[in-house]
Amino acid sequence: LAKIFRNQLSGRAPPARPQDARTWRETMTPIITAFERSPDGGKGLARDTRVRWALEETGQPYEVRLVSFQAMKEPAHLALHPFGQIPTYEEGDLALFETGSIVLHIAERHAGLLPGDANARARAITWMFAAVNTVEPPILELMTARILESDKPWTKDRLPLVMDRIRDRLTQLSPRLGKADWLDGAFSAGDLMMVSVLLRLRASGILEEYPGLSAYVARGEARPAYQRAFEAQLAVNTGKPPTG
């Protein structure tokens, strides 16, 4: 973690590319991009935390290139992420964007986040899609209404509607989890993505209305790999090396 922290602050360029392309792909440490200063101040809500978590769960070293909001709109970054967002993921000749895609790539390449059984593997991937396609959209609507549209005349009427849509999703999700620790057997990339999405509800108080889901998120946060990922992104915002 200390090495990663030093690379984050220095913006160190990646090592020179070896002549052997196969060696390059196999030995190149992945580089992800993250906010130079996260809008949440290091609460772990920026999407690079999901990618850090996946890399930590699979025991993979990585480097971080910090980018400013201005740099995110410049050609060099847009070549990696056409929508000018973070994170991006570079590994040799491969460049990816979108956290679902990045986490799936990591999970498929390294052991620890997808089951060996083909059917269980497919279900874990399904939960990844459910997290970002079904559960997250109304949560993002809530954040948009509260943060970016708080001064708009329609916000007061819109907020209750958005919160009801979130409750609908949580009411559907809660019985699927039931009393189990994770969504489908052992912890998987599906849980990683779902916990990451639900963490965005922490400040709203809605999650506490669903004790089973609240405990589920707490289990995810308690995982050592999540703790390492959280500390690494927090260090960027505090300027202090991770404690782990």
Language model feature labels by segment:
Residues 231-244:
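Terminal-tail/helix-coil boundary detector
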Residues 1-9, 15-19:
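Cationic, amphipathic, low-complexity segments that mediate targeting or membrane/lipid association
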Residues 68, 189, 233-234:
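Short, solvent-exposed turn/loop segments enriched in Gly/Ser/Thr/Pro and often Arg
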Residues 107, 197-198, 230:
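Active-site-flanking alpha-helical
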Residues 131-222:
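GST-like fold's C-terminal all-alpha helical module
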Residues 8, 23-158, 167:
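GST-like domain detector, emphasizing the conserved glutathione-binding G-site
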Residues 79, 222, 231:
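Phosphate-coordinating loops and pocket residues in cytosolic domains that bind phosphorylated ligands
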